[in-house]
Amino acid sequence: MALHLTTAGESHGPGLTCIIEGLPAGLEIDRGALDRDLARRQLGHGRGGRMKIERDKVDVTGGIRHGRTLGGPIALQVANRDYANWEERMNPWPVPAELAEVHLPRPGHADLVGTQKYGLTDVRDVLERASARETAARVAGGAVAKAFLGALGVSVFSHVIQITGVRAPRRDDLEPIDFAAVDESPVRCLDADAGRAMVAEINRLRKANESLGGVFEVRAFGLVPGLGSHVSWQERLDGALGQAILSIQAVKAVSIGDGLEVAGLPGSEAHDEIFYDDERGFWRQTNRAGGVEGGMTTGEPLVVRGAMKPLPTLTKPLRSVDIATHEPAEALRERTDSCTVPAAGVVGEAMTAFVLADAYRRKFGGDHIEDVRRALQAYRERIGWRPR
């Protein structure tokens, strides 16, 4: 049984919708946990003025009754409070006023190619859906996926490891407890010194009318070995994770484990040697593979990184062309953030959680959450694996 997640809605439209299909009945859902993840997505030094307007909360319109899933599609909605300021321009129905079209595509955004592909004359018809505001719906859905994983002993976290050239020291020994206070950092960085340097870098480049990119890392703990498969490229878990992380707006690269770093190492230094003892079963001293070998989880923590480019909406616009007149012009000026890497980490959590939840559904099936637990326990006993 596969899991499906679909979102709908525009950045300044009435709201965003997320529909999740494939979760079992009987799963407990905490509305507060969903709202907390939505609030976490709005965190981070370098956010723009819209974060002062939106106070995202989730409304459930189907699939959950009295805090438990029913087994059918789950429908979630997140209202756009800013729609009150855009109602005329973003109304789903015709309005009497004649509205000026936007003809100035931004380099690095979906604007130009979107108008070409869909035969549109107004860039706003593209940018509203392409906006990262859409990820609020994904985070809401990802929070439901995290609830499912949590019921199976799996936890998912994220932190920022780099903003422009400022990088936090590498940590290979992270445990779930280490993430308890990550959201107290203004850039969601676990290293206090690096976090302060990142804040200073954001301030410096924001004054120069620049935007900033960086790298976030997602870690998942408690995963059973064998999620995914080696037998078909479509079933390889690392392929699904790569697609999910790359689908996040402005993410340009993804790595699992040491990723590109192992390309520069000899084979004897690139892999994780295997050990066995009666207490732990099979185990590895290192985790260069990031918890995935041959397209399958190994039982070690999953480590996924996403590299985000600087946002393409700039307060000092780049050169562009008016799509109506074909004359040179500056790109569109639009309200924007300077840096959203901390928020992207929260979105990365949601997307990773969805992929992992889908992998558990495909492997263990079940119409009720207790069916899933029993199937998981039987599998653990068969392979002799104990959660660490």
Range-by-range predicted roles:
Residues 1-388:
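Generic N-terminal targeting/processing segments that precede catalytic cores or assembly contacts
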